[in-house]
């Protein structure tokens, strides 16, 4: 089925034997359990200030499964980098706490597995969350990402956001008779 890895193991099941032209009743001596493995992947990103590209630390990003609504937070490290991969920070360390850049992340049921991706097959919404370290900037718009391949790391690249525009105040005088901005001499 879509979203699962193909089981390439051949499972042999003894269904009965033929004796004198007739088959004996079906008996299964050892039940066979065939487990389907859900495709899993990861994502990574770099967060930087627009114009200067200064790396931004401790910026939270919420990742939400569009299929289940399950949601967890990852934070950028001191170099502005973040990843859901166990190679970055094991899934099994402070799983889904979302309090530091070193907390692991895992979506779905079951025990976190550091040999697999954190995100099961599907579409995810990625949102930058407001915090002290990005309060002077406009948050990037939320965007979707799709996990479709086993163990693929989706590189979101460097995400930047603009500073809030600085309000400007000014005056402009117009000549009442001519309507121009030039005064009479």
Positions of PLM-derived features:
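Solvent-exposed loop/turn and edge beta-strand elements of beta-rich ligand-binding domains
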Residues: 1-185
């Amino acid at each position: 089925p879509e979203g699962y890895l193909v089981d390439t193991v051949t499972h042999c099941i003894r269904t009965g034997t033929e004796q004198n032209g007739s088959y004996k009743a079906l008996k299964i001596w050892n039940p066979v359990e065939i487990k389907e493995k859900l495709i899993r992947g990861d994502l990574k990103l770099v967060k930087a200030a627009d114009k200067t590209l200064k790396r931004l630390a401790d910026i939270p990003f919420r990742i939400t499964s569009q299929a289940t609504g399950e949601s967890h937070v990852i934070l950028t490290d001191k170099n502005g980098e973040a990843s859901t991969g166990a190679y970055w920070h094991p899934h099994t360390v402070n799983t889904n706490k979302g309090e530091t850049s070193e907390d692991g992340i895992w979506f779905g049921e079951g025990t976190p597995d550091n040999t697999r991706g954190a995100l099961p097959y599907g579409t995810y919404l990625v949102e930058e969350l407001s915090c002290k370290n990005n309060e002077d900037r406009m948050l990037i718009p939320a965007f979707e990402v799709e996990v479709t391949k086993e163990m693929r790391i989706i590189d979101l690249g460097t995400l930047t956001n603009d500073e809030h525009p600085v309000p400007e105040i000014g005056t402009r005088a117009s000549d009442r008779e001519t309507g121009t901005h030039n005064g009479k001499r």
